[in-house]
Structures are given as structure tokens and as C-alpha cells.
């Protein structure tokens, strides 16, 4: 970790990766998830299919299709410099210096080669309703295990929890999932969405009500917390089909679409790109403002996460998303910019 004018900046290191299998997620899953027809896959048989398998074997584990093992290993110097310049232009340097603002921006147009920039990515902050995405993950894990049913009523309740940020819906789903189950899931080796070695992450330690906390996060005593990095990891795993399964990742993403609350990222982005697709969850409580999204338009896809502690935080995020969107397009590698 280095520091630029007092705020934490993730070092830009050489990207490393993992090979064709990620936990329960395999290369074939990735190909199907990203649009390859199953019928087409079946047609790849005989010598062609054998050649494909032999190619993977001969290439060895170091050369098979990769996704990064950790987003912190994908820092892009051009994107990083652009983000820092944008913060200066928006007069937000002081906020980052005092750790009142944390940001992660990841270009995932090519999911096998993400480009990340960040400021204070591991700063744990109160995130209000944003951690409802963790409840969504817990529900789909239960569904995958046959312990919950994805019936129309459950789907409607989860959609209301995410798009309208309904506290009542969140509490209903949280109690069906189980508080202890969710806490264990977030800390599991499979997801590490709450990681003590990275200063925490996504945490849901109480219902969204006046009731007391069930279990505050171990490091910072927060009831509903997040770091920008772990939220970005959630969205990256979602987009690459690694939350629960490729099919259930798609269903979770569809629930995150069409946000009903039009502030922060949505307000800023729709003012300049009204046709953009936003898969999003935000949070607001007093001076705490957070937003997170996968954003798609004009051939590019990226993850944006920002957490702020300021009465002006909502305005910060509306302005920031416009600058980050512009940066994604201006900093795109030449080969991708043509797509």
C-alpha cells in the first residue's frame, strides 16, 4: 500500500491469475454463462473436442483460461492516475485524505482482464442498506441447497428488498436465511466477502429495524458494514457467474436491475447516459451514503463502488459516477475501445 497526499492507494502490481477451475465454477460453465450455445458445445466433438482438451492439458495450468485470483492484483496505472485526477477536479481530495470517501472502479469489459483503480478500498464504513446484497446471496445459497424455494412470492420479496430497499422485505429474507448462516457464509473460504486480513467487508449484524444488533462485525463493531473492495468483489463474482452458480448469478443480477430509487449513481449517470443499464444497490442513513453497481452502455461494462461519510455524500456520488464513467471510456485500451 502506498499513499498519495495522505490517502490509501492500492499498488498497481502485475496481474496474476487462477486457472480453468474456480471452486465449483469451471471453464465450461464460463463459456455457457457468457453466451455459448449448449447445442454448439455438443457439436464440438470427436477430433475437434479432443484437440481442445489436449490444448488445455499441453498448455498447462499456467496458460489455461484465467480469471484474476484477487482484484487487488489488477490495478491499472492509467485508470488509477485518472481516478486520482478526477478526485482533484471534484475537490474530493480532502475527503479521501480523511478517509471519508472510499472508491473502487473496475473495468470488466473483458472479464478475464479487469482493470482496477481505487482509493481507500479497505476502509470499513457503515453502509446502511447496501449490505442487503449479502442477504440476497444468502437466500440464493439456501435456494441452491434446496433449503428455500424460489417461488413467485419469494422472488417478489427479494426484488422489493433490492430495488425499493424495503427494510421489511430484507428482514423477512434475512430471518429465512438465518443470521448465523449468513455471517458464516460471508466469512467462508469460498467467498471471503468479510475478510479480517483485508479489514473486514460485507457484514449484516442486525435486522433493518430498531431492534438491537445480533452480532456486530468483529473488527469495527458495525451493524451493517462494507468495504469498497469487497463490494466490488461481490459484483465481479456475480458477473463471472461465481456467486452460487452461473444460472443463479444471472438471476441475482436480474434482481439488481431497474432500481426504483433514482439518486446517487442513478441520478448522475442517467443525466448523461439515459440508456445505460444499471444493476445496483445503494444505502443511506444520516451522513452515510453508499452506492454500488455494474454499469453497461456503449459496449463497455464496469463496476463502480463508493462509500461516503458526509452530509454532501449523495451529491459526491452523483458527480463521481459521471467522472468515473468518462474515465472508463477515455482510459480504455485501444483494442477494447474499438469494440
Predicted regions and their residues:
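Active-site SXXK
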Residues: 124-148, 161, 304
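Structured C-terminal helix/loop/strand segments within mature extracytoplasmic catalytic/sensor domains
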Residues: 65-87, 223, 233-339
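Mid-domain, small-residue-enriched loop/turn segments at the edges of structured enzyme/sensor domains
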Residues: 173-243
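A short, well-structured edge-of-sheet supersecondary motif
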Residues: 82-120, 295-296
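Short, well-structured active-site flanking segments
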Residues: 141-159, 245-249
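Bacterial N-terminal signal peptides
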Residues: 49-57
Amino acid at each position: 500500500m502506498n499513499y498519495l497526499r495522505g490517502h490509501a492507494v492500492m499498488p498497481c502490481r502485475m496481474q496474476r491469475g487462477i486457472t480453468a477451475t474456480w471452486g465449483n465454477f469451471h471453464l465450461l460453465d464460463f463459456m455457457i454463462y457468457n453466451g455459448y450455445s449448449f447445442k454448439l458445445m455438443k457439436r464440438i466433438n470427436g477430433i475437434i473436442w479432443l484437440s481442445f482438451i489436449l490444448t488445455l492439458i499441453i498448455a498447462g495450468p499456467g496458460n489455461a483460461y484465467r480469471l484474476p485470483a484477487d482484484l487487488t492484483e489488477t490495478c491499472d496505472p492509467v485508470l488509477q492516475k485518472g481516478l486520482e485526477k478526477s478526485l482533484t477536479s471534484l475537490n474530493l481530495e480532502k475527503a479521501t485524505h480523511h478517509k471519508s470517501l472510499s472508491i473502487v472502479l473496475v473495468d470488466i469489459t473483458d472479464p478475464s482482464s479487469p482493470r482496477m483503480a481505487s482509493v481507500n478500498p479497505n476502509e470499513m464504513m457503515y453502509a446502511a442498506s447496501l449490505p442487503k446484497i449479502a442477504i440476497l446471496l444468502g437466500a440464493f445459497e439456501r435456494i441452491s441447497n434446496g433449503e428455500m424455494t424460489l417461488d413467485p412470492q419469494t422472488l417478489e420479496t427479494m426484488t422489493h428488498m433490492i430495488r425499493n430497499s424495503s427494510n421489511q422485505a430484507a428482514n423477512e429474507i434475512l430471518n429465512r436465511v438465518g443470521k448465523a448462516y449468513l455471517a458464516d457464509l460471508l466469512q467462508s473460504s469460498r467467498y471471503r466477502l468479510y475478510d479480517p486480513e483485508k479489514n473486514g467487508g460485507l457484514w449484516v449484524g442486525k435486522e433493518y429495524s430498531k431492534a438491537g444488533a445480533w452480532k456486530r462485525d468483529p473488527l469495527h463493531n458495525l451493524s451493517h458494514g462494507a468495504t469498497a473492495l469487497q463490494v466490488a468483489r461481490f459484483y465481479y463474482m456475480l458477473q463471472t457467474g461465481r456467486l452460487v452458480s452461473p444460472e443463479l448469478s444471472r438471476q441475482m443480477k436480474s434482481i439488481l436491475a431497474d432500481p426504483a430509487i433514482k439518486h446517487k449513481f442513478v441520478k448522475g449517470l442517467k443525466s448523461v447516459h439515459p440508456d445505460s443499464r444499471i444493476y445496483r444497490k445503494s444505502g443511506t442513513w444520516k451522513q452515510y451514503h453508499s452506492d454500488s453497481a455494474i454499469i453497461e452502455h456503449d459496449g463497455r461494462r464496469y463496476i463502480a463502488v463508493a462509500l461516503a461519510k458526509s452530509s454532501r455524500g449523495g451529491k459526491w456520488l452523483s458527480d463521481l459516477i459521471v467522472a468515473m464513467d468518462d474515465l472508463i471510456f477515455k482510459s480504455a485500451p485501444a483494442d477494447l475501445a474499438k469494440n
